[in-house]
């Protein structure tokens, strides 16, 4: 089909990555009967925006792969919940109680929130709730379950058998100091239940056991099977790929230097290494890496307080190979660009559609946007009207789009509520109004005069055209309720008052009337906010009543 042909050539990055997966498989379905796309989750903290990004992007590649290959696939979310708790995360209650459980597997640490059997189980539940909220289709696998149920026994026994080979790979990557005590096996102490980082005294290939000194110095021998022992994280990666026959895994740039290690170990343990894809990490507004336990940057819940999950998926689609700052200012832009792309999609040919982010966000099943007003404009409305509720916002929306309603435009309705919230939390605290300069004051007076009388408005536009040496424009149908006509007036006033750069005039409008340094097309804003209301706003700005 045309779609299939275009997908095979498409330059969109999910198709690029999907073609690599297909090439690795030499176009053949694996013996297990499906192609496995894996994402990993370290449940030391709550799922964060990076977790979402990884799963969302993997799902985009998985979908692109299905389109080009027609093969069945599976998305697995694998939680490393047998890892020892290295430190108590700063963002959980009952910190003191948690201190007693350091180094114990996360699934053996009590849940500080008191809702689950363990801290690991709590964070796993958060992950699943989180993935379910976004409608991801995935299978959840738990490391604890895989180790303790014996599902990893075969690969663990093979690791004992290939111990020297795996150690050789690992030691080459370690500093001398670390080499002395390093072991690929981490026994779980039968006495304290802690995950131990201790050197091996012996590794017995015949009976699949390891011998080491426990924390109290007692020589101890354990079978590597049944969850007595886990693998260090680098060998663990390779072993998991081998045990599950993983075909694709993406991860953050911080892992990229270790990939060849994971791959080698996977091969030593008897399976081909998967396809990989690296993405750059997210930074907070200060350019620092976002971390789970620190909780800096924008959390998922915070994003969803001010915008839809689709806008977040849109943000994740953009240039995965570039480090992106994740802070609150990016939200309005992501929302508006997402809706621009939705509108564009339904007019595009197949090639352009496959290149459109919304194709990948919605797996080809792209909805129609009902956002009749951009989010940035809603924010300015909320700002200038000090709207406290969604209903107040609808009063303005209906001036502009009389047929729109919360029932027929549910996305718009949500956005109106988001705008009120975003305004209160981010715009209001940072609003700074200023007095106009003499030039700006005169121009604002003229703008108000043009809004009062349509004849005055027309004569201002005529004057601008005359001064610019342009032919007069036919203004018979000129209307003060049309956003474009109002924009012509704002433009003409700026020109007539000799603003060298019209951006300075628009900036003055925003700073004096809205208390912000940038804003929407002001003509569109007037048509939404109302002509009389805008005249009143200009007068308040001229009288200094807006200055806090």
Where are the language model's segments positioned?
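A glycine-rich helix N-cap at a beta->alpha junction
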Residues: 95-130, 134
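Secondary-structure transition/capping motifs at alpha-helix termini
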Residues: 66-71, 267-274, 500-501, 548
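Catalytic adenosine-cofactor/nucleotide-binding cores of aminoacyl-tRNA synthetases and other
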Residues: 254, 259, 280-418, 514-548
